[in-house]
């Protein structure tokens, strides 16, 4: 048998023409050689390799986006709450994730702190003071905004004086500088327009443009190396612009919220007189347009969805979607079904818009389907029955409420106060949602913070 196999091999190799074609289909090694010879030269080229890799990456990116979109759609119905104990702090107004386990928060009682979501540990951060202390201590204002720059190397928030802008370096939270000569009233909102420039919106109706220069950063590093106590610079604004004031109610032109469109370098602003303003924001601020909002009561929150090119504005009971390229009569609005309590926070994640209300609810709006996510029918024993078609709604826990003199005099007959969702933010994975706030009535003192995952 061995000699016979050898003779066939010799015969096949001796007849490379027709004999090879006849025997090729019967022997794997002849067939594979034949296939290799037929590969076109272009498939071995660098150009073909790069094109193939590009197509593969596009397919992987498309698949990844589909996966993230599906996760964003399914996640809200799976979220479970874990509350944190914040002691006697009063109302968390602002929050941002620093990393996968730390969230930085600002409160009405002017406290800046970091919470570890794994251990629940609270670490307070020293707030930065003006060059010259103000003559009057302002009560009941606090820290309303916290924002990280695009590279996540700097953090902007309010200072000890709520009219001032404070800048910290990340991840150490070392102080860098204070902008303390701009606004005459509280800072309500902040937006970074690049890695070194931020805009602040104030209750005095002005918007300040601030720059953290390389010189400021270098001097800040040098001071930290030689001084045992925190030291920081004091900077002045590059520009200070007033928003247009409505003739009928000029005293209510307070800048309440900001959101930046990085692609077009445009900054959206919402004022409490019910207007949306659009500014070109690069090295200065140039007004582009102002438009009256369809629902103009309690416009206190704003977010920009880059993928959808729309701004989402919260009001007393509605979320309105504005595309500055479209006429104002094309503005679409959806009702939260929680009239009177107000939309207190709003954010985009994939195609889902998360809405936090004054009644302690989290609602989820699907911008593609143009409807709120609905409850799933649960077949679990003992679960609370839900009606088909009900909006999916997550409700915050009890938090902590101070039974002080105000509560005893005016609210002691009310057993439970919902905690308004003043702030919420997703982590980088989109699977954890930090939610915080406190009681809605301004005279009540309390807090709430929780991780939904």
Curated annotation (Swiss-Prot):
Region annotation Required for nuclear location and interaction with MOV10: where it falls in the sequence: 1-38
WD repeats: 138-178, 182-220, 250-289, 338-375
Annotated Basic residues bias: 1-12
GO CC annotation, single: centrosome
Gene3D superfamilies: YVTN repeat-like/Quinoprotein amine dehydrogenase (2.130.10.10)
Record-linked SMART domains: WD40
Mutant phenotype after disruption: Knockout mice are born at expected Mendelian ratios and manifest no apparent physical abnormalities. Mutants have testes that produce fewer mature sperms, an altered percentage of CD4(+) T-cells and natural killer (NK) cells as well as increased splenocyte apoptosis after T cell activation.
Chief localisation class: cytoplasm
Pfam families attached to this UniProt entry: Beta-prop_DCAF12
Region of interest: Disordered: 1-34
InterPro entries the UniProt entry points to: Beta-prop_DCAF12, DCAF12, WD40/YVTN_repeat-like_dom_sf, WD40_repeat_CS, WD40_repeat_dom_sf, WD40_rpt
Protein localization: Cytoplasm; Cytoplasm, Cytoskeleton, Microtubule organizing center, Centrosome; Nucleus
Record-listed Phosphoserine modification sites: 15
Keyword annotations: Cytoplasm, Cytoskeleton, Nucleus, Phosphoprotein, Repeat, Ubl conjugation pathway, WD repeat
A Gene Ontology BP annotation from the UniProt entry: T cell activation
KW Nucleus (keyword) present: yes
Pathway where it operates: Protein modification; protein ubiquitination
GO MF annotation list: ubiquitin-like ligase-substrate adaptor activity
Presence of keyword Cytoplasm: yes
Family label: Belongs to the WD repeat DCAF12 family.
Task of the protein: Substrate-recognition component of a DCX (DDB1-CUL4-X-box) E3 ubiquitin-protein ligase complex of the DesCEND (destruction via C-end degrons) pathway, which recognizes a C-degron located at the extreme C terminus of target proteins, leading to their ubiquitination and degradation. The C-degron recognized by the DesCEND pathway is usually a motif of less than ten residues and can be present in full-length proteins, truncated proteins or proteolytically cleaved forms.
PANTHER family per UniProt: DDB1- AND CUL4-ASSOCIATED FACTOR 12, DDB1- AND CUL4-ASSOCIATED FACTOR 12-RELATED
Assembly, per entry: Component of the DCX(DCAF12) E3 ubiquitin ligase complex, at least composed of CUL4 (CUL4A or CUL4B), DDB1, DCAF12 and RBX1.
Protein name: DDB1- and CUL4-associated factor 12
């Amino acid at each position: 048998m061995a000699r016979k196999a050898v003779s066939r091999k010799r015969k096949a190799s001796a007849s490379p023409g027709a004999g090879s074609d006849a025997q090729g289909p019967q022997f794997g090694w002849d067939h594979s050689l034949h296939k290799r010879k037929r590969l076109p030269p272009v498939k071995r080229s660098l150009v073909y390799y790069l094109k193939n890799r590009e197509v593969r990456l596009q397919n992987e990116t498309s698949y990844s986006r589909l996966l993230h979109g599906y996760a964003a759609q399914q996640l809200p119905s799976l979220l479970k709450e874990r509350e944190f104990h914040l002691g006697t702090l009063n109302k968390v107004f602002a929050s941002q994730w620093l990393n996968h386990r730390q969230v930085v928060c600002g409160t009405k009682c002017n406290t800046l702190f970091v919470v570890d979501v794994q251990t629940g540990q609270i670490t307070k951060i020293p707030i930065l003071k003006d060059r010259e202390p103000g003559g009057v201590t302002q009560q009941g204002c606090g820290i309303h905004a916290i924002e990280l720059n695009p590279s996540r190397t700097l953090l902007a928030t309010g200072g000890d004086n709520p009219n001032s802008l404070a800048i910290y370096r990340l991840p150490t939270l070392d102080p860098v500088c204070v902008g303390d000569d701009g606004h005459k009233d509280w800072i309500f909102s902040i937006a970074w327009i690049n890695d070194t420039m931020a805009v602040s919106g104030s209750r005095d109706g002005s918007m300040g443009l601030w720059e953290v220069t390389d010189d400021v950063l270098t001097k800040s590093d040098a001071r930290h190396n030689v001084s045992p106590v925190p030291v920081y610079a004091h900077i002045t604004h590059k520009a200070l612009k007033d928003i247009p004031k409505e003739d009928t109610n000029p005293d209510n032109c307070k800048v309440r919220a900001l959101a930046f469109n990085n692609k077009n370098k445009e900054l959206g602003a919402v004022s409490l007189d019910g207007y949306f303003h659009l500014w070109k924001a690069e090295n200065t601020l140039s007004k582009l347009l102002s438009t009256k909002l369809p629902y103009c009561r309690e416009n206190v929150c704003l977010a920009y969805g880059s993928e959808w090119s729309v701004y989402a504005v919260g009001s007393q009971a509605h979320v309105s979607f504005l595309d500055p390229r479209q006429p104002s009569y094309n503005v679409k609005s959806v009702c939260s079904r929680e009239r009177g309590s107000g939309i207190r926070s709003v954010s985009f994640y994939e195609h889902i818009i998360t809405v936090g209300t004054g009644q302690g609810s989290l609602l989820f709006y699907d911008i593609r389907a143009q409807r709120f996510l609905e409850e799933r029918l649960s077949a679990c024993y003992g679960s609370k029955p839900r009606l088909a078609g009900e909006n999916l709604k997550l409700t915050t826990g009890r938090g902590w409420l101070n039974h002080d003199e105000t509560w005893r005099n005016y609210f002691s007959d009310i057993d439970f106060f919902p905690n308004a969702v003043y702030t919420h933010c997703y982590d980088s994975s989109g699977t954890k949602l930090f939610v915080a706030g406190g009681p809605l009535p301004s005279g009540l003192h309390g807090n709430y913070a929780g991780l939904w995952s």
